Amino acid sequence: MATTNLSYYDKATIPNAKSFRFGIVVSEWNPEITTNLAKGAIDTLMDCGASIENIISWEVPGSFELVYGCKKMIESQKIDAVIAIGNVIQGETKHFDFVCKGVTQGIVDLNIKYDVPVIFCVLTDNTKQQSLDRS
């Protein structure tokens, strides 16, 4: 599992984001992790030229609701891309598998249906510590 250099990118290879409008849909579940991820996404967008006024952020209860939140954002806001941010941690039941599969397939479906890219930023780790390390 990668836990180092996760935030490295070559800024010279990224187009300037000044003229783009971004949406971020964040799961409220495991907020100590998803808040870090959202902050990192916003900081990165702004580092690439996006203005805070052009970044819309919505919250949904959990990762399973990310798909619905992204769909509604695409349909109601004029955005160029949306980032789905969530966290699912393995437990003792199959719930983890169902949530991960549903969210993944839902985001794939949104990317097929709409001309607005939906970026998958959902950590699916075995432990909370792994998620904290990666966030």
Predicted regions and their residues:
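Extreme N-terminal tail/first-helix region
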Residues: 1-16
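Structural motif
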Residues: 23, 56, 65, 80-82, ...
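Short, ordered loop/turn segments at secondary-structure junctions
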Residues: 29, 87-88, 122-127
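Short helix-capping segments at alpha-helix termini
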Residues: 46-51, 78, 113-114
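Glycine-rich phosphate-binding loop
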Residues: 65-107, 111
